[in-house]
Amino acid sequence: MALNYFNRYIWLIEVINRHGHISRKDISDLWARSQLNELGESYLPERTFHNHISSIFDTFGIEIKCDRSLGYYIAN
């Protein structure tokens, strides 16, 4: 189970890094098509998304922030 979360964190970091700035909706749409989406969820739940952002900071020291007009981005 922990490995699955770790892989999700890496996936989220890679998605945001690849796009520079990306909307919450676009992240959710990409999640719906991801191979890591083992439950076949049609979106990435909001609470899960924010928990992942917090865990990414705690685990890797990578800060993900949101610019309301541009979307999510890696701040450091």
Predicted regions and their residues:
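Short, basic/aromatic recognition patches that contact phosphate-bearing ligands
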Residues: 1-76
